């Protein structure tokens, strides 16, 4: 119940999602799921010290995907992207931690895998921009919008990470 209240509070006061409480939305795309990269991707974020507060495997509807990628609706690849994202299971996740939005983007790598450094998810596992394994929110604002789009407030789990004192000063 406390978690639900905190989540609703965070929707009303976005500044509540800062510091070690910052949250981001990540989605392992159908290619990442089919290639069995889910465990490896989760492992990387856990080893970094971030907390997984929500996860679900789902077949995303066209309506959800069109809302999710609304900012890209004028791009020539928009319909192809929506069709591709609906072609198989997606692993939707919410991660929490200090500067998680920015750090997750660094860990993921560039949108075009050819520009991604080794050690990043896309640098290690991707070749083609159209099959780049994972989506990550690009700002706190988009993270809040995407989390609200993919998850109900009661699906976000608040928990105290016993390793937190070993991660944050």
Curated annotation (Swiss-Prot):
Gene3D superfamilies: Nucleoside diphosphate kinase-like domain. The keyword Methyltransferase does not apply. The active site is at 135 (pros-phosphohistidine intermediate). The keyword Transport does not apply. One of its GO terms (molecular function) is nucleoside diphosphate kinase activity. One of its GO terms (cellular component) is ciliary basal body. It is a peripheral membrane protein. Belongs to the NDK family. Catalyzes the phosphorylation of ribonucleosides and deoxyribonucleoside diphosphates, other than ATP, into the corresponding triphosphates with ATP as the major phosphate donor. The ATP gamma phosphate is transferred to the nucleoside diphosphate beta phosphate via a ping-pong mechanism, using a phosphorylated active-site intermediate. Through the catalyzed exchange of gamma-phosphate between di- and triphosphonucleosides participates in regulation of intracellular nucleotide homeostasis. Required for ciliary function during renal development. This is Nucleoside diphosphate kinase 3-A. It comes from Xenopus laevis. The gene is nme3.S.
């Amino acid at each position: 119940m406390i978690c639900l209240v905190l989540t609703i509070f965070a929707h009303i006061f976005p500044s509540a999602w800062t510091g070690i409480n910052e949250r981001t939305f990540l989605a392992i795309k159908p290619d990442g799921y089919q290639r069995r990269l889910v465990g490896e991707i989760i492992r990387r974020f856990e080893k970094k010290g971030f907390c997984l507060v929500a996860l679900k495997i789902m077949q995303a509807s066209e309506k959800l995907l069109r809302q999710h990628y609304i900012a890209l609706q004028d791009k020539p690849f928009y319909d192809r992207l929506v069709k591709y994202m609906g072609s198989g299971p997606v692993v939707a996740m919410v991660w929490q931690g200090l500067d998680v939005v920015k750090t997750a983007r660094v860990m993921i790598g560039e949108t075009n895998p050819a520009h991604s450094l080794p050690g990043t998810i896309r640098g290690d596992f991707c070749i083609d921009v159209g099959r780049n394994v994972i989506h990550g929110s690009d700002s706190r604002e988009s993270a809040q919008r995407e989390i609200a789009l993919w998850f109900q407030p009661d699906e976000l789990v608040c928990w105290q990470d016993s390793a937190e004192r070993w991660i944050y000063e």
